[in-house]
Amino acid sequence: MPVFLNSSHSNFKKDFEMLLSSKREDSIDVDISVREIIGLVKEQGDQALIDYTKKFDRIELTPEKLRFTESELAEQILKVPEKERSALKLAAARIEDYHKRQIPNNAFWTDESGVELGWRWSPITAAGLYVPGGLASYPSSVLMNAIPAKVAGVSRLAITVPTPDDKINPLVLLAAQLSGVDEIYRVGGAQAIAALAYGTETIKPVDKITGPGNAFVAAAKRQVFGKVGIDMIAGPSEILVLADGTSRPDWIALDLLSQAEHDENAQSILITDSDDVVKSVRKKIEVNLKNLSRSEIARKSWNDNGAIIKVPDFDVAIELSNRIAPEHLELCVSDPEKLAKRITNAGAIFLGHWTPEAVGDYVTGPNHVLPTARSARFSSGLSVMDFLKRTTLAKLSRDALLKIGPSAVTLANSEGLECHGLSISERMQSNSD
C-alpha cells in the first residue's frame, strides 16, 4: 500500500527519511556483461552489432542493412496517420521555439588593466541519441533529445533504435525526420552505445550520447563516459503534487497515476494541507485503477512507491518539496506563482490547475528529459547547453602583461613552478613588440 504520512506525528522525521532513501531501481548487476559487449564491439565492429542484433532482436542484418535507407524511411513515415502527424509537428515546432531561446551569447570586453577577455560558444561536432525500440518506443523522446542538439548547431546527429522482429514505430522515424536527424541505425542495447562511442566500419563515433534505456544501456553509458560525454543516468519517473483546497481531486488522482503508469518503479507523491483532498484523492485513485489499460503497472507503482503527506501549511510543504527535489513538480494551488518563487529544487515546475505534467511531456516546449532520484538538487534537464562548449578567450598587450604579470610570477614561484614564472618574466623584460 502507498505510504500515508502526517508531518505533525512524532515519527514523521524517520518515516520521511525512509521515503527519501527508498531504492526504486532494479538492482541488476550488468556491468560485467556490458564490459564484454563493449569489448567485442571495439574488437569486431559491425560484425559484433550484427551478431548481437540476431541474438536479441531476432533479425538478420548485413553491414549495408544496419542503417535505414531514405526509401525505407519514406515508406515507414507514410504509415503515420494525419492526426498523429499533425500532433508531432506541433510538438516539434514548440520544442524548437522554446530551445532557440536558450542559445547563449558570446562575450568579449577589455578590463581596467587593458586585458581583452571573453568567451565563445560552439556546438559539439557529433551527437548520438539512443531510442528504446519496438512498437512502444516514444517519439516524444526523440524530439526532446534531438531538437536541442540541432538548435545548438550539432552538424551530425545519429540515432540508434532496436527493431525487434524487424518492427519499428513509424512515429519514431517521423520524429527523427522532423528533428533533422542525419543517420538512423537498427541497433540497440549496450552494443549501440559502444558503437556510438568507439565507432565501427559503418557507424562513425560521436562526441556525446543522450537518451534513455534499460539497465544495460545505462551501464554502457557509465562505462563509455570519458571517451564521450553523456547526458545523465535517468532513474524511474517521479511526480510531486502540492495541492490545496482549491484543487480538483479527480484531476490530481489522474496526474499521480500518469507517472505511475510509466513503470512499476515510478513514484507519485501528494503533499496537501487539506484532509478532504487526502480522502478524495485516495478514492479517485482506486476508482481509476480499475479502468486503466495499464492498471497492473500503475497499481504496483502506486502501492509500492506512492505517498500522501498531510502538512499543517505550505511552509512545511515547500520545505519537504525542496528536500524531495522531484523530477516533476505540480503546484495545484490558488497562487502557484507565489509558491514557485520558493522552490529551489525541481526538474520542472507546472503552475496552476490547468497545467498537468502530462502536457509537458509532449507539447509545452520545455524538455522532458529531467533529473531524477533527487538529483535536481544539483543538476538540470536536457537543454541546448548540453550540446555546446564554452571556450574562454584572453589577449594581453605588453602593457597589460606588465600590469598583472608580476602577480602571476609571484604565484608561480610560490607553487615551485619555475618555468611558469620564466615564461611570463621573459616577456616582461623584452623590448620587442
Named regions from a protein language model:
Residues 323-433:
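C-terminal core of ALDH-fold dehydrogenases
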Residues 232-304, 308:
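A conserved active-site cap/scaffold subdomain adjacent to cofactor or substrate pockets
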